[in-house]
Amino acid sequence: MKLRASVLIGVAILCLILSACSNYAKKVVKQKNHVYTPVYNELIEKYSEIPLNDKLKDTPFMVQVKLPNYKDYLLDNKQVVLTFKLVHHSKKITLIGDANKILQYKNYFQANGARSDIDFYLQPTLNQKGVVMIASNYNDNPNNKEKPQTFDVLQGSQPMLGANTKNLHGYDVSGANNKQVINEVAREKAQLEKINQYYKTLLQDKEQEYTTRKNNQREILETLSNRAGYQMRQNVISSEIFKNGNLNMQAKEEEVREKLQEERENEYLRNQIRSLLSGK
């Protein structure tokens, strides 16, 4: 019995050794200039794109997040992972806020691994320093049977839907009904439509102001032109009056000269007659 037990123990040990040898570790790769620091292959593999999470990509959601507004950077380190996880799994991203800030966020997301097929919609607003991001990965068609999930992504964020808010890591199915989602989407669209209408009204006011300014300039030019024409006419009239005055003066002088000449001739005749009568 002891011999049989020893044989069984030896066989068991041999099996363990063989199984351990069959699961040997993968060969390591030595990096340049670091010959004494082995690195596993998995740590240096490069991917052409960031893979999607199997659960999150199939979970319909719609999230409204208030993004921070820092002067020197966009996101804190603790916010980067969750924000990019949300952006990367979205099909549509709407950014509302300051025009320069929302453009910075769009370029930042696209330059740091966000999928190229994500549709970005930028809605600039006035007097709003922060940025609101609305991210969704579901079809808002009323016939869509999928129920969107809401998440509390960042601390201080405001979920867009009021039904059973879940954490982004939970992947729990929300109890939000499709009708509520449609109503929320309709309200957001109405808000965006108000923003668009505001900008249209602002543009119309600017155009009206420009038209009024051009009309005022035209009226001023016409007034100046009329004044210049009036002044020219006055100058012409004054010139004519002066000219006519000179002509009248010359005519009067000529008349006086003629009268003087006539007086001299008459005086000469009278003297001749007196001489004849006196017999001289």
Swiss-Prot record:
Question: Which chain positions have N-palmitoyl cysteine-type lipid attachment?
Answer: 21
List the PROSITE patterns.
PROKAR_LIPOPROTEIN
Task: Name the UniProt key words of this record, in alphabetical order.
Answer: Cell membrane, Lipoprotein, Membrane, Palmitate, Signal
Disulfide bridge map: none
- Signal peptide (from-to): 1-20
* Cross-referenced InterPro entries: Cag12
Major location category of this protein = membrane
Lipidated positions (S-diacylglycerol cysteine) are: 21
Compartment list: Cell membrane
Record's superkingdom? Bacteria
Got a GO cellular component term for this one?
Answer: plasma membrane
The name this protein goes by in its record: CAG pathogenicity island protein 12
Gene behind the chain: cagT
